[in-house]
Amino acid sequence: MHALLQSLSGGDRRSIGESNRVASIVLEQPGLMKVLFQGIESSDPVLRMRCADAIEKVTVNRPELLIPYKRKLLQKLSKIEQQEVRWHIAPMLARLPLTREEESSVLNILLGYTNDRSSIVKAMAMQALADIAYRNRRLLPEVKQHIEELIVIGTPAMKARGKKLLGKLVNLSTE
């Protein structure tokens, strides 16, 4: 096992372990992204979660590092059912440059995530939907409609997040 993955192994899912340190290392050595993408496919749920966390942190500043893994994200990793992975995959999907066909696929994935048992996954999916609509205003009406629906049926946290996102989306559509 690669040393980077070893540093993310062990413990339980209540801790991010060395994810922050690993993200810093990968920012300095972007070639190590491939190691994190190997780890996210591990059978170990702790390692999967921490690799997803580190990748998500790296791509806040360097979203272009996701591009070589776009197909894998869309076709395989987005289907991982582990909630701690999903809540990191959602913002990654929103950071990808997407064709119209891929955009449609990502919207469907994220809408599926809004039905997840985890309220964190739901909230992250709502945020990712809004982020995509900010970037592509053509999607504003559809995303606004979905967020309005989620505000009605969601948890208190989803309602609060949804209202905040909806306010920003409404402002965008009037610009």
Stretches found by the model and what they are:
Residues 1-175:
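Alpha-helical scaffold domains
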